[in-house]
């Protein structure tokens, strides 16, 4: 055993360095959050609860093109299109998402040409029954109305990367 190793063991260098390291972290602010009361930041690309958006005049955006239904790998989306209107457009009569099947891949949002179906910022939608996870058009539109400000802000932040 050489002299430097003996000196280090006598002076308890590892103990002292560990003690100062512990003291440094002891007085730092805690990195954890008190979750139900504090929420961390969410990325603009976060994929949470689905929502159907409306135009500013209140008309729903969905044009019943059924691209989201076709691209969904889990086959969680069911759409029934209504008859064509006088102006040539059509809207959905039925728009259902089975959230039990959904894998939150975001392909429906990417496929939508008018940004009608989006995945919003809400990640707290636990339910007591499976039936509550079958979203119909009214529930999706209500989600869109509730989260419109956050959704439009996230889409604007993500626009340069699309």
UniProtKB/Swiss-Prot annotation:
Where in or outside the cell is it found?
A: Cell inner membrane
Locate the coiled-coil region(s) and give their ranges: none
Q: Which reaction does it catalyse?
A: a quinone + NADH + 5 H(+)(in) = a quinol + NAD(+) + 4 H(+)(out)
Q: Which GO terms describe its biological process?
A: aerobic respiration
| 4Fe-4S ferredoxin-type domain location | 52-82, 93-122
Example GO molecular function: iron ion binding
Which top-level enzyme class is recorded in the Swiss-Prot or TrEMBL entry? translocase
- Supply the EC number(s): 7.1.1.-
Q: Out of the domains of life, which is the source?
A: Bacteria
| Subunit structure and binding partners | NDH-1 is composed of 14 different subunits. Subunits NuoA, H, J, K, L, M, N constitute the membrane sector of the complex.
Q: What does this protein do?
A: NDH-1 shuttles electrons from NADH, via FMN and iron-sulfur (Fe-S) centers, to quinones in the respiratory chain. The immediate electron acceptor for the enzyme in this species is believed to be ubiquinone. Couples the redox reaction to proton translocation (for every two electrons transferred, four hydrogen ions are translocated across the cytoplasmic membrane), and thus conserves the redox energy in a proton gradient.
The family database entries (PANTHER family) matched by this protein are listed as: NADH DEHYDROGENASE [UBIQUINONE] IRON-SULFUR PROTEIN 8, MITOCHONDRIAL, NADH DEHYDROGENASE UBIQUINONE IRON-SULFUR PROTEIN 8, MITOCHONDRIAL
Q: What is this protein called?
A: NADH-quinone oxidoreductase subunit I
UniProt organism field: Bradyrhizobium sp. (strain ORS 278)
Taxonomic lineage of the native organism? Bacteria, Pseudomonadati, Pseudomonadota, Alphaproteobacteria, Hyphomicrobiales
Q: Which gene does this sequence derive from?
A: nuoI
